[in-house]
Amino acid sequence: MNPNQKIITIGSISLGLVVFNVLLHVVSIIVTVLVLGRGGNNGICNETVVREYNETVRIEKVTQWHNTSVVEYVPYWNEGTYMNNTEAICDVKGFAPFSKDNGIRIGSRGHVFVIREPFVSCSPTECRTFFLTQGSLLNDKHSNGTVKDRSPFRTLMSVEVGQSPNVYQARFEAVAWSATACHDGKKWMTVGVTGPDSKAVAVVHYGGVPTDVVNSWAGDILRTQESSCTCIQGDCYWVMTDGPANRQAQYRIYKANQGKIVGQTDVSFNGGHIEECSCYPNDGKVECVCRDNWTGTNRPVLVISPDLSYRVGYLCAGLPSDTPRGEDAQFTGSCTSPMGNQGYGVKGFGFRQGTDVWMGRTISRTSRSGFEILRVRNGWTQTSKEQVRKQVVVDNLNWSGYSGSFTLPVELSGKDCLVPCFWVEMIRGKPEEKTIWTSSSSIVMCGVDYEVADWSWHDGAILPFDIDKM
């Protein structure tokens, strides 16, 4: 066979192989179309079966592919349904970490907002961290002077719980230097307070749209909770204060449905002071543990019924939970009166557990450092000092700050009771540290059926930043 014949032979064989390969592909495609196109194929080919087990819990999506089943659980919530939130608070033995955002550590090199007053609130499908920005980023010149509480640059924004308050994932909620937010099962409602001290306005948003307003009625820094409001069967409740921070002020409870205010009532509390309430649903009512910035080192308690009737007093426990405060041994509790004669204060929280109470407080008696939560037997109804449990969340070598409450709804947790949760703000920068800015990160804890060991989930950022050295 001469060279030309060899070339022709090899070429013919190659062409034959190519044609054979093409025919195999064509046959494969035809067989696949015929098999997948059949109806009633006994479930052995690609088929999706959707079974709704409970309209408020999940859809079970089963995909069967050549006798191999893949089960994917898809969270499902009927957005036309209100959350109930009339269940009791779960009885818990300790609190386990839920999330930590590490915002300041990340912000040394990332695009993270300068914030204060972070808080958490949950819908039937997710929890979000809300926070008040200063309209500036960490490690940037506009962070200078952000120790100031109220400015036209402050806004309420939110991210999924656990995310840092960063530029790329944050969602705008309202223009605000004081705020609250909650979900009724259908949409988010936010209340953002902004404007001048003497004529501040609270703008109610529902589903992201302004729906109502509350104007300052006392002309002295209208303000609200700085934590989650509370929705029960479609109605949402929150508490507002207008008046002095260091003497008698005025207090109101508001009730809204789909972002429209449908009721309000003044709280009569002569001699007592209410600010920055931390509220949660329990047994069909709203229970709030607040801040007395006037005299008391015990915390005001406000229990709100759906008809806006209320009971107001103080947390009975014989242990103080505000800061600054005196020695535990020298404190005598009261269910009706402020005790301790210490001005100023810090936002805090408590949870009723039957007649017991879980109460959070800074470890330091004089500064916002460290954080612990105590369970006091009969502390909701009596001046008891009996601690049955204590858990450290931030050690006393590290800064803390505000703290507040929220609950996991049964639609989210799958339990038949409301899981009690709390967050602790960890303030960094001015006035305690040598920076030009003030900001914070947070740790979030939720109740569990087990005791949890003490540890310190502190902020951990190394200061000062580059901007502070310029």
From Swiss-Prot:
<feature type="disulfide bond">
    <location>
        <begin position="279"/>
        <end position="288"/>
    </location>
</feature>
<feature type="binding site">
    <location>
        <position position="368"/>
    </location>
    <ligand>
        <name>substrate</name>
    </ligand>
</feature>
<feature type="disulfide bond">
    <location>
        <begin position="122"/>
        <end position="127"/>
    </location>
</feature>
<keyword id="KW-0812">Transmembrane</keyword>
<comment type="function">
    <text>Catalyzes the removal of terminal sialic acid residues from viral and cellular glycoconjugates. Cleaves off the terminal sialic acids on the glycosylated HA during virus budding to facilitate virus release. Additionally helps virus spread through the circulation by further removing sialic acids from the cell surface. These cleavages prevent self-aggregation and ensure the efficient spread of the progeny virus from cell to cell. Otherwise, infection would be limited to one round of replication.</text>
</comment>
<feature type="glycosylation site" description="N-linked (GlcNAc...) asparagine; by host">
    <location>
        <position position="67"/>
    </location>
</feature>
<feature type="binding site">
    <location>
        <position position="296"/>
    </location>
    <ligand>
        <name>Ca(2+)</name>
    </ligand>
</feature>
<dbReference type="InterPro" id="IPR001860">
    <property type="entry name" value="Glyco_hydro_34"/>
</dbReference>
<feature type="binding site">
    <location>
        <position position="291"/>
    </location>
    <ligand>
        <name>substrate</name>
    </ligand>
</feature>
<feature type="disulfide bond">
    <location>
        <begin position="90"/>
        <end position="417"/>
    </location>
</feature>
<feature type="binding site">
    <location>
        <position position="116"/>
    </location>
    <ligand>
        <name>substrate</name>
    </ligand>
</feature>
<dbReference type="GO" id="GO:0055036">
    <property type="term" value="C:virion membrane"/>
</dbReference>
<keyword id="KW-0326">Glycosidase</keyword>
<feature type="topological domain" description="Virion surface">
    <location>
        <begin position="36"/>
        <end position="470"/>
    </location>
</feature>
<keyword id="KW-0735">Signal-anchor</keyword>
<feature type="active site" description="Proton donor/acceptor">
    <location>
        <position position="149"/>
    </location>
</feature>
<keyword id="KW-1015">Disulfide bond</keyword>
<keyword id="KW-0325">Glycoprotein</keyword>
<feature type="binding site">
    <location>
        <begin position="275"/>
        <end position="276"/>
    </location>
    <ligand>
        <name>substrate</name>
    </ligand>
</feature>
<feature type="region of interest" description="Head of neuraminidase">
    <location>
        <begin position="89"/>
        <end position="470"/>
    </location>
</feature>
<feature type="disulfide bond">
    <location>
        <begin position="182"/>
        <end position="229"/>
    </location>
</feature>
<feature type="transmembrane region" description="Helical">
    <location>
        <begin position="15"/>
        <end position="35"/>
    </location>
</feature>
<feature type="glycosylation site" description="N-linked (GlcNAc...) asparagine; by host">
    <location>
        <position position="46"/>
    </location>
</feature>
<feature type="disulfide bond">
    <location>
        <begin position="231"/>
        <end position="236"/>
    </location>
</feature>
<feature type="binding site">
    <location>
        <position position="292"/>
    </location>
    <ligand>
        <name>Ca(2+)</name>
    </ligand>
</feature>
<feature type="region of interest" description="Hypervariable stalk region">
    <location>
        <begin position="32"/>
        <end position="86"/>
    </location>
</feature>
<feature type="glycosylation site" description="N-linked (GlcNAc...) asparagine; by host">
    <location>
        <position position="293"/>
    </location>
</feature>
<dbReference type="GO" id="GO:0046872">
    <property type="term" value="F:metal ion binding"/>
</dbReference>
<dbReference type="InterPro" id="IPR036278">
    <property type="entry name" value="Sialidase_sf"/>
</dbReference>
<keyword id="KW-0479">Metal-binding</keyword>
<feature type="disulfide bond">
    <location>
        <begin position="277"/>
        <end position="290"/>
    </location>
</feature>
<feature type="glycosylation site" description="N-linked (GlcNAc...) asparagine; by host">
    <location>
        <position position="144"/>
    </location>
</feature>
<feature type="binding site">
    <location>
        <position position="150"/>
    </location>
    <ligand>
        <name>substrate</name>
    </ligand>
</feature>
<feature type="topological domain" description="Intravirion">
    <location>
        <begin position="1"/>
        <end position="14"/>
    </location>
</feature>
<comment type="similarity">
    <text>Belongs to the glycosyl hydrolase 34 family.</text>
</comment>
<dbReference type="GO" id="GO:0016020">
    <property type="term" value="C:membrane"/>
</dbReference>
<dbReference type="GO" id="GO:0020002">
    <property type="term" value="C:host cell plasma membrane"/>
</dbReference>
<feature type="disulfide bond">
    <location>
        <begin position="421"/>
        <end position="446"/>
    </location>
</feature>
<protein>
    <recommendedName>
        <fullName>Neuraminidase</fullName>
        <ecNumber>3.2.1.18</ecNumber>
    </recommendedName>
</protein>
<feature type="binding site">
    <location>
        <position position="322"/>
    </location>
    <ligand>
        <name>Ca(2+)</name>
    </ligand>
</feature>
<keyword id="KW-0472">Membrane</keyword>
<dbReference type="GO" id="GO:0004308">
    <property type="term" value="F:exo-alpha-sialidase activity"/>
</dbReference>
